[in-house]
Swiss-Prot record:
Disulfide bonds: none annotated. The gene is rssA. GO terms for molecular function: lysophospholipase activity. Keywords: Hydrolase, Lipid degradation, Lipid metabolism. PROSITE patterns: PNPLA, UPF0028. Belongs to the NTE family. Pfam families: Patatin (PF01734). A motif (DGA/G) lies at residues 155-157. This is NTE family protein RssA.
Length: 301
């Protein structure tokens, strides 16, 4: 009797992606062996480490991050393409991950990216592993796109935030999907909602027009108890809204067999220094799904 293959589809989610580490560790702990891994964006970075038996090294690296470590890894770009070049963080990632071809991974692995010219998803099932990861992680506007075979490639989440279809195409009989964006609306409400006291509102509205203009430009100190979202927050939150709609549509037509959803609304897009909290959320999410996961262990598939 042929052994049933279990596939893991790791979704996008930026800093929440460290939850994938907790999910994988928890699955291993209960005896569920993953045969196939497909990743999108941060899911490709974590998935590749697992596929190459380097997950422990990745966990050691990311759990050592401080807030200032993350800032130092952000190499601002003054050129076109994105706010960050992305070279600094991926150069350090190369110290953990071997330079290898995708087909040489210990487990079947693939990453998804988006072709900006065609608008279609591109599946990396062979070739340069680091190229695939770098392309899949290129959040539009935030990180510079990757040139490949005459095309510009960006984050796979633009077209396929949770690569369930790719996991099945690689031969998975059962797909466990990890969704990191299901509770993003909680963070969006916190980010985009605010209260202005009546007193402050009246004071602000009573300012002459030229003073209000200077206030908006930041030339004088605002009298309102309001902190407007930054340009990066607006961009990333908008992308999350679009990704969530796309994700729901795709999963309606191609649902996973088991869906794991770590809860970590307190971790925002660039909170990569909060790996401990994200990993714990991933482990807890697996524990909550044990009723669905235990049959995979009991049947020894």
């Amino acid at each position: 009797m042929r052994k049933i293959k279990i596939g893991l589809a790791l979704g996008s989610g930026a800093a929440r992606g460290w939850s994938h580490i907790g999910v994988i560790n928890a699955l291993k702990k209960v005896g569920i062996e993953i045969d196939i891994v497909a990743g999108c964006s941060i899911g490709s970075l974590v998935g590749a480490a697992y596929a190459c038996d380097r997950l422990s090294a990745l966990e050691d690296w990311v759990t050592s991050f401080s807030y200032w470590d993350v800032l130092r890894l952000m190499d601002l770009s003054w050129q076109r393409g994105g706010l960050l070049r992305g070279e600094r963080v991926f150069n350090q990632y190369r110290e953990i991950m071997p330079e290898t071809e995708i087909e040489n991974c210990s487990r079947r692995f693939a990453a998804v990216a988006t072709n900006l010219s065609t608008g279609r998803e591109l599946w990396f099932t062979e070739g340069d592993l680091h190229l695939a990861i770098r392309a899949s992680c290129s959040i539009p506007g935030l990180m510079a796109p990757v040139a490949h075979n005459g095309y510009w490639l960006v984050d796979g989440a633009v077209v396929n935030p949770i690569p369930i279809s790719l996991t099945r195409a690689l031969g998975a009989d059962i797909v466990i999907a990890v969704d990191l964006q299901h509770d993003a609306h909680l963070m969006q409400q916190d980010l985009l909602s605010f209260n202005v006291s009546e007193e402050n509102s009246e004071n602000g509205d009573s300012l002459p027009w030229h003073a209000r203009l200077k206030e908006r430009l930041g030339s004088i100190t605002t009298r309102r108890a309001v902190t407007a979202p930054t340009a990066t927050e607006i961009m990333t939150t908008s992308i999350q809204v679009l990704e969530n709609r796309l994700k729901r549509n795709r999963m309606a037509g191609d649902p996973p067999d088991i869906l794991i959803q770590p809860v970590c609304p307190q971790i925002s897009t660039l909170d990569f220094h909060r790996a401990h909290a994200a990993i714990a959320a991933g482990q807890l999410a697996v524990e909550r799904k044990m009723d669905e996961l235990l049959p995979l262990v009991r049947t020894n598939i």
